[in-house]
Amino acid sequence: MKKRLSLDRRFLPYIKKAGGVLVKKQMGAYVSLAAAMAIVGSSVVVGKLMVERIPVFLSSGLRFLIASVVLLMLLFCIEKGFPALTKKDVFVLLVQSFTGVFLFSICLLYGVQYTTGTESGILTSTTPMLIGILSFFLLREKIEKKTLIGILLAVCGVMAINLFGAGSQDGTPHALFGNMLIIAAVIGEALFTLMAKLLSPHISALAISTFVSLFGFLFFLPFALFEASSFDYSVPTVLDWSYVLYYALFVTVLAFYLWYSGVTKVPAGVSGIFTSVLPVSAVILSGVILKEPFEFVHFIGIACVIGGIFVTVIKKKQPDAYPAAEEKTL
C-alpha cells in the first residue's frame, strides 16, 4: 500500500501562487486609483489659484498641449508608436475626452467661481454613487452588497466633511448656476469612468492617456486661441504659470496614467468608490495650502471614506477548495 497526493493537491501550490499574483495586481489597481484621485483632488485647489490670473480655456489648452507632447514622447519611446484602434475605440475615446476632460474641466473651474467650495464638495461626493448606479443600468454590472455599503459610507463621509465643516453656511451669489455646473462635472466624471470599460483590452494605459489628452487639446484649441488673442501675458507671474505646468504633468499625465492603469482591472462600481478620494484630498489640501479651517468633523468624514474603500476592496477568506485528504492506491 502506498499513498500519493491527488491531482488537485499536487497542483494546489501553483493554483495558490496564481491567485496570489491576481490579488497583488488588484491591490496595485486600488493603489493606482486612489493615487490618481488624490492628485485630481489637488487640481481643485491649484485650479482655484490658476484661474485667478489665467482664463479657463487658455490655461486648459496649454495644459493639454504640454501633456500631449510629454505623453507622445513617452508613447513613442516605450511602445514605438500608436496602437491599432477600432471605430468603437475612437468613439469611446472621443466621448471620454469630451465628458471627462472638456466638460469636467470647464464645469469644475467655472463652477467653483459661482458656488461655495462646500456645496461643490457635497455635489462631487455623489460621484461614487452615480457611477455605481450607472454601471448597473448601462453596463449591467451587479452591485455587490459590500460595494453598496462602501459607496454609502464614502458618500456619507464626504458629505459630513462638507455639510458640518467650517463655512457650511456661507452663501455665494449665483450659487444655483454654480451648482448646476458642478453637477454637470460630476456626470462627466461618471461617464469618463464607465466608458473606460468599453475600450479594447490591448490598448495600454499610456496609449489611452495619450489619446484622451490629444482629443482634449483639440476640444479646447479654438476657445483657447480666442482667449489667447486678447490676453495680457504680463499679468500672470512665474508662480501662476507653474500651476499650468503642474496641471499638465501631474493632474493630466500622471493622474491619467494611474487611473487607466487601475480602472480596467476592477468593476466600474469598485473604481467608482475611489472617486470619493477626490473631495477628501481637496479638503485636506485646502487646509494646508489655502489655510482653510480643518475641524474634527473632517477627520470623521475621512475615516468614513477610508472605511468605505476598505469595505469595498476587502476580500472574504475563501474556504479551501482542495482539502488535505489523500487518496489511497494499491
Curated annotation (Swiss-Prot):
Q: Where is the EamA domain?
A: 38-163, 187-314
Entry coiled-coil feature ranges:
none
A single Gene Ontology CC term? plasma membrane
Write out the entry's keywords from A to Z. Answer: Cell membrane, Membrane, Repeat, Transmembrane, Transmembrane helix, Transport
Pfam families, per the entry: EamA (PF00892)
State the compartments where it is located.
Cell membrane
Q: How does it sit in the membrane?
A: Multi-pass membrane protein
Say yes or no: keyword S-adenosyl-L-methionine present: no
Q: Which residues cross the membrane?
A: 27-47, 56-76, 90-110, 119-139, 147-167, 176-196, 206-226, 243-263, 270-290, 294-314
Q: Return the protein name.
A: Uncharacterized transporter YetK
Source organism phylogeny: Bacteria, Bacillati, Bacillota, Bacilli, Bacillales
